[in-house]
């Protein structure tokens, strides 16, 4: 089957580049920004990996696996050749109670902890119609302890019932990203949560539906404008296909080698500085 060529991401990039308002920002770099945007990706049409530049799949996969360990240590990533968190890591490699800590070990007032990911899997298996299948990384009490406050802050799962007898439900995921670095960050975020949706669907014996990305402050940094212009001059290809080689015993048992991306056609990588 011929896969369609989608360009939601490039459309957002073009919108911000042409209509964004000039704003100052925390890093002192300066941005062009729009507020509020949504993209919907049908995961049955292909895996939404940006094709107008090469995206570093190893970093995306390993970062997601790191989140799922619940670790706060950058050493876990650097030991696997991933350096995307180096700019924020403290001298001892610790990053504070960032994404994985909140996902797996949200602290409660009585001294306990909540494993939000385990709760998601449990609820999807026992009560898939629930409207409370949500994971939040935005823990207000912990924000000042984090090396970087969560950009992708909250996500929710939704199961559409099977349309025929004996069929499977379809799992969709919606992410709210309060701060969206369009050039560097968003391609990673789309792919990361699309991958997580596939993994959760496999663990819960569901088919995949849509991944919906909702952005708050959607911005292009002033020192990314040349790179954005180059990328917008390229024609996108069809998205690749994802093959998960095995079904592990739990959502926490996946390994890097479990994921294979087929027919990933892409333009060359484009380097750009990260705003810290």
Swiss-Prot record:
CDD domains, per database record: TS_Pyrimidine_HMase (cd00351)
GO CC terms of this entry: cytosol
SUPFAM superfamilies, A to Z: Thymidylate synthase/dCMP hydroxymethylase
Record field: catalytic activity: dUMP + (6R)-5,10-methylene-5,6,7,8-tetrahydrofolate = 7,8-dihydrofolate + dTMP
Active site: 151
Subunit structure: Homodimer.
Protein name: Thymidylate synthase
């Amino acid at each position: 089957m011929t896969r369609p060529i989608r360009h939601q991401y490039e459309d957002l990039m073009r919108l911000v580049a042409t209509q964004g308002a000039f704003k100052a920002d925390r890093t002192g770099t300066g941005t062009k920004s729009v507020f509020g945007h949504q993209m919907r990706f049908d995961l049955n049409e292909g895996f939404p990996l940006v094709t107008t530049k090469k995206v570093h799949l190893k970093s995306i996969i390993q970062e997601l696996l790191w989140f799922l360990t619940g670790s706060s240590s950058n050493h876990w990533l650097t030991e696997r050749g991933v350096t995307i968190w180096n700019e924020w890591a403290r001298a001892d490699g610790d990053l504070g109670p960032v994404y994985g800590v909140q996902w797996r070990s949200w602290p409660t007032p009585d001294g306990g902890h909540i494993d939000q990911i385990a709760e998601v899997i449990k609820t999807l298996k026992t009560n898939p119609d629930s409207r409370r299948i949500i994971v939040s990384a935005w823990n207000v009490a912990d924000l000042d302890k984090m090396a970087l406050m969560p950009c992708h802050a909250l996500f929710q799962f939704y199961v559409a019932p099977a349309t025929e007898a004996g069929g499977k439900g379809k799992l969709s995921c919606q992410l709210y990203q309060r701060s969206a670095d369009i050039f560097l960050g968003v391609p990673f975020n789309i792919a990361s949560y699309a991958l997580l949706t596939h993994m959760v669907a496999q663990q819960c014996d569901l088919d995949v539906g849509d991944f919906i990305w909702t952005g708050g402050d959607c911005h292009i940094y002033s020192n990314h404008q040349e790179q954005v212009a180059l990328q917008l001059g390229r024609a996108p290809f069809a998205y690749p296909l994802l093959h998960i080689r095995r079904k592990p015993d739990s959502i926490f048992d996946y390994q890097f080698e479990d994921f294979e991306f087929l027919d990933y056609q892409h333009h060359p990588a484009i380097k750009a500085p990260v705003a810290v």
